[in-house]
Amino acid sequence: MDLSLAPTTTTSSDQEQDRDQELTSNIGASSSSGPSGNNNNLPMMMIPPPEKEHMFDKVVTPSDVGKLNRLVIPKQHAERYFPLDSSNNQNGTLLNFQDRNGKMWRFRYSYWNSSQSYVMTKGWSRFVKEKKLDAGDIVSFQRGIGDESERSKLYIDWRHRPDMSLVQAHQFGNFGFNFNFPTTSQYSNRFHPLPEYNSVPIHRGLNIGNHQRSYYNTQRQEFVGYGYGNLAGRCYYTGSPLDHRNIVGSEPLVIDSVPVVPGRLTPVMLPPLPPPPSTAGKRLRLFGVNMECGNDYNQQEESWLVPRGEIGASSSSSSALRLNLSTDHDDDNDDGDDGDDDQFAKKGKSSLSLNFNP
């Protein structure tokens, strides 16, 4: 393989470079002129670019563009595309490359025993300065396609690394990220589906009206979450104002019952009362209230008649309550209720005893 060798003297290399530049200019001049020699009336004839075979790319490192003035070629690529003669390994050889603009570049290519690497030294620093290469840029090496003479032609190209800030600005700019919330009139008809789950508004306090509304009102539920909007069914409408009634403190939950005393059992904690017995019993008028008592009421072991007062928790859990009603005047006939009331009011001899027997 012919690698365009040149003498190592500076004068001869400069002369060859000038000759290559003149040859390039002559080719451009001949291509710009037409068959008649008048290029004013005829369009410019463009020579198609030569066919090239890509060899390898090299991402330049800070040391490649630093003060060392050398470019390290990977060993596998150097031995494959730029083999060196062992007899001339010490001085190296000169390689000619043509860039995209048609300018010829000549680099000294050699092998360093100290670092055991293949490097390009002479002429590389001028290439870096002219192309303004920086760490991260890519240098591409190519060669011609065709016969042996075409394959001996070497080409060099370069491209700068992309500016990541501009790339990110271009990518994210297409999405139109902004923090301006849309107006209600413009986006009032646009809705987005919410996930399939039942959301319960979050309150600092519980209100029995709001609590029941949040569970049983299926037409419209207030949803408090990230952003602004109202929940109607399972659709979340954007642009709607937030209902601030859901985030303010509401009245606490109050149940109308007897206050709970520690160590005591209240009627609220007892089982529900069963319906009254249907058997006909004895009628008794007490404090102006008609009361009916079964015939075997006193003989029942358990009774669900619970007074509104407080009952000992220990006694109520192990035994039933027994209510004994006794009067000094037993009116078995129960003929006149009004007479009993008058007699009770005048004499005051009637008595009521409540015995809670364990």
UniProtKB/Swiss-Prot annotation:
<dbReference type="GO" id="GO:0048366">
    <property type="term" value="P:leaf development"/>
</dbReference>
<comment type="function">
    <text>Regulates lateral organ growth. Functionally redundant with NGA1, NGA2 and NGA4.</text>
</comment>
<dbReference type="GO" id="GO:0003700">
    <property type="term" value="F:DNA-binding transcription factor activity"/>
</dbReference>
<feature type="DNA-binding region" description="TF-B3">
    <location>
        <begin position="56"/>
        <end position="162"/>
    </location>
</feature>
<feature type="compositionally biased region" description="Acidic residues">
    <location>
        <begin position="329"/>
        <end position="342"/>
    </location>
</feature>
<feature type="region of interest" description="Disordered">
    <location>
        <begin position="310"/>
        <end position="358"/>
    </location>
</feature>
<dbReference type="GO" id="GO:0003677">
    <property type="term" value="F:DNA binding"/>
</dbReference>
<feature type="compositionally biased region" description="Low complexity">
    <location>
        <begin position="25"/>
        <end position="45"/>
    </location>
</feature>
<feature type="compositionally biased region" description="Polar residues">
    <location>
        <begin position="1"/>
        <end position="14"/>
    </location>
</feature>
<dbReference type="GO" id="GO:0006355">
    <property type="term" value="P:regulation of DNA-templated transcription"/>
</dbReference>
<keyword id="KW-0539">Nucleus</keyword>
<dbReference type="InterPro" id="IPR015300">
    <property type="entry name" value="DNA-bd_pseudobarrel_sf"/>
</dbReference>
<feature type="region of interest" description="Disordered">
    <location>
        <begin position="1"/>
        <end position="45"/>
    </location>
</feature>
<keyword id="KW-0238">DNA-binding</keyword>
<dbReference type="InterPro" id="IPR003340">
    <property type="entry name" value="B3_DNA-bd"/>
</dbReference>
<dbReference type="GO" id="GO:1901371">
    <property type="term" value="P:regulation of leaf morphogenesis"/>
</dbReference>
<keyword id="KW-0804">Transcription</keyword>
<protein>
    <recommendedName>
        <fullName>B3 domain-containing transcription factor NGA3</fullName>
    </recommendedName>
</protein>
<dbReference type="Pfam" id="PF02362">
    <property type="entry name" value="B3"/>
</dbReference>
<dbReference type="InterPro" id="IPR044800">
    <property type="entry name" value="LEC2-like"/>
</dbReference>
<dbReference type="GO" id="GO:0005634">
    <property type="term" value="C:nucleus"/>
</dbReference>
<keyword id="KW-0805">Transcription regulation</keyword>
<dbReference type="GO" id="GO:0009908">
    <property type="term" value="P:flower development"/>
</dbReference>
